[in-house]
């Protein structure tokens, strides 16, 4: 990956450590951390972004679209935990023969997620899925606070019927009165 003028490849490497979990080394092709939970709701493709139409809707993304490393725990009692760290938020989605440049005023980012399928040995709960995730990006400028993102929700599948509820939020860390804090 270092043969392209000291630029990184837009690659992902998955390492399965058997009973110890999984490790994913990712150069920003998204899907890691809370980015995996940005929209877990049941869909009939009614969302505009489901048809590749731009909406301006701010979904949580966390460390996912940045160069990152994610550890996924083995599933125990229906629960899976992931921890994702991005050493420099803003260095992301890099194509071959390209580079992302400086990450700006942001430092490292980290995500923690928990996904639970609490079947408890019953057939009726086999379709229940609970999820929660949080992200924090460290700002390196003294006039800005850290950025925080969070998401949580549940889905329930029973036969062909799928129901869900989720909520997410973003605190940008911006100090100026005219800046939007989602």
Regions found by a protein language model. Name each.
Residues 1-182:
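Outer-membrane beta-barrel proteins
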């Amino acid at each position: 990956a270092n043969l392209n003028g000291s630029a990184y490849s837009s690659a992902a490497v998955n390492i399965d450590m058997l009973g110890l979990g999984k490790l994913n080394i990712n150069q920003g092709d998204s899907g890691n951390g809370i980015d995996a939970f940005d929209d877990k709701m049941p869909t009939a493709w009614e969302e505009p972004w489901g048809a590749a139409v731009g909406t301006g809707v701010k979904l949580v993304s966390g460390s996912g679209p940045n160069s990152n490393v994610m550890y996924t725990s083995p599933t125990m009692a229906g629960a899976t935990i992931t921890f994702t760290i991005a050493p420099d938020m803003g260095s992301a989605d890099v194509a071959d023969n390209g580079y992302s440049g400086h990450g700006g005023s942001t430092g490292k980012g980290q995500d923690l997620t928990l996904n639970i399928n609490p079947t408890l040995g019953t057939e009726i709960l086999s379709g229940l899925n609970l999820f929660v995730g949080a992200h924090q990006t460290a700002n390196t400028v003294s006039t800005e606070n850290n950025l925080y993102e969070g998401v949580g929700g549940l889905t329930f599948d029973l036969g062909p019927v799928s129901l869900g509820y989720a909520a997410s939020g973003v605190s940008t860390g911006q100090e100026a009165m005219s800046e939007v804090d989602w």
